[in-house]
Amino acid sequence: MLISTKGRYALRMVIALAKLEKEKKAPVSLKDIAEAECVSMKYLEQLARCLSSKGIITSSRGKYGGYRLSDQPKNILAGDVLRAAEGSTAPVSCLEGDTPCPRQDVCTTESIRRGLDAVIEKYIDSVTLADLLKE
């Protein structure tokens, strides 16, 4: 699995959000996250939509609005953040989606690909946001 810039920035965004939310004890603006992570507001807006649509963060409007984590850091998985941003964590494109590869029955590398996919999924789903905050 190659984690794209979008996936890395999504992880950075939720880590920064967790830190800033803990400090402020209030919703956090994208401006504050952008400044903390040196990422453009426009890019964070795209990520916020992805993360919000998957229920990882929530937003509120108004003078005291902003973003919050939808759950405690110990309950938010790195895998969920990456899947929200990336769409898929499959190591090869033929493992993505519901349609099986037409060469599945004769493919000599399928077991390696499936094994690799299982290891990646297991690992990223074992790392929580709380774990990342400790680093």
Segments the model singles out, each with a brief description of its role:
Residues A48-R49:
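Short, hydrophobic-biased segments on the C-terminal half of alpha helices
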Residues S70-E135:
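Non-DNA-binding regulatory cores of transcription-related proteins
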Residues M1-V14:
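Short alpha-helical segments that sit at the start of domains
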Residues E35, S52-S53:
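Alpha-helical residues within the helix-turn-helix
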Residues G55-L69:
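Beta-hairpin "wing" of winged helix-turn-helix
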Residues M13-L20, A84:
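Short amphipathic alpha-helical elements of helix-turn-helix/winged-helix folds
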Residues V28-C38:
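A short alpha-helical element within helix-turn-helix/winged-helix DNA-binding domains
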